[in-house]
């Protein structure tokens, strides 16, 4: 199911200052909000740090030192992002001095080893053109970089997208100078306005042949209500439907796919009296998988933390946010 969801970010955006993050995560199983540009610029945010801990029912909080970090420029554009993940365990040497009692050594110096977490950190850097559109997204994972290059048409739609595996030829690893570059994939997109409420996007492979088609539906207020995806040479289909409440807020998202049999995933939203997302429930089929609860500062109304209840694992993911400002 996950491979269908990434393209949804192309055209979905809800730029309300009251709404601090978009209700369209690129990954249905992601535990992070996608902060909106109006939220960043309105509050003059420079950096956001997220500290992540995990707690199983009837157990103490487990802090593995996991974190995420977003860095923005003064125009609200995301410049850098990184996240840490646990790679495994390593042994750390611990030196123990000799033990003396009444001037007499009763235990000699010793060495012991204790397990500690080993981390992987993925860094992503973003580059923009004069129209403030992303043209390069470069992610470093170890010695290699996965880089996506974007080109746009006159209407601001992504027209070409190329993904490369790259190396850094610079001796200073904090500076990037292109070394070896290998093409991994290349796509082109063509757009057709069918009517005032419908638009079609064709996905072309590196041979210029259409392999996928996306049809977007909008209401009379310009809000997207449905997205249908279909592959040209296979039976696979997927759709996303958005339902809005009387205040124009997303009330429900429904995702369906036949990629692995008939699958459905649904998100339901409740809001505070201040028009902020309060609770989000995510279902797979009829089973509740995750329940999000969002906590805000009473005075600034900024997001301070959110809790993700994993119903099947009987556990909670706790994410706390801290900010730096311009």
Predicted segment positions?
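Buried hydrophobic residues that stabilize the cores of well-folded domains
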Residues: 19-326
């Amino acid at each position: 199911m996950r491979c269908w969801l990434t393209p949804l970010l192309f055209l979905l955006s809800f730029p309300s200052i009251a709404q601090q993050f978009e209700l369209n995560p690129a990954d249905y199983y992601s535990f992070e909000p996608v902060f909106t540009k109006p939220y960043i610029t309105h509050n003059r945010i420079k950096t956001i740090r997220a500290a992540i801990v995990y707690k199983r029912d009837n157990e103490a909080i487990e802090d593995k030192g996991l974190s995420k970090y977003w860095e923005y420029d003064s125009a609200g554009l995301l410049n850098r992002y990184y996240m840490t993940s646990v790679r495994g365990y390593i042994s750390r040497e611990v030196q123990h001095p000799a033990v003396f009692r009444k001037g007499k050594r009763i235990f000699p110096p010793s060495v012991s080893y204790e397990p500690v977490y080993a981390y992987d950190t993925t860094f992503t850097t973003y580059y923009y053109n004069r129209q403030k559109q992303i043209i390069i997204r470069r992610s470093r994972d170890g010695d290699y970089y996965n880089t996506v290059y974007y080109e746009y048409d006159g209407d601001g739609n992504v027209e070409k997208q190329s993904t490369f595996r790259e190396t850094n030829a610079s001796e200073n690893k904090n500076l990037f100078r292109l070394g070896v570059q290998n093409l991994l994939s290349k796509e082109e997109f063509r757009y057709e306005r069918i009517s005032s409420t419908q638009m079609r996007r064709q996905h072309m492979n590196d041979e210029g042949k259409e392999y996928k088609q996306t049809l977007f539906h909008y209401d009379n207020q310009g809000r997207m209500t449905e997205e249908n995806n279909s592959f040209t040479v296979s039976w696979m289909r997927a759709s996303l439907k958005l339902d809005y409440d009387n205040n124009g807020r997303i009330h429900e998202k429904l995702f369906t796919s036949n990629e692995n049999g008939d699958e459905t995933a649904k998100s339901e939203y409740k809001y505070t009296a201040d028009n902020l997302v309060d609770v989000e429930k995510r279902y797979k089929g009829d089973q509740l998988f995750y329940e999000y609860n969002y906590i805000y500062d009473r005075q600034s109304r900024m997001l301070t933390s959110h809790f993700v209840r994993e119903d099947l694992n009987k556990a909670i993911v706790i994410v706390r946010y801290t900010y730096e400002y311009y």
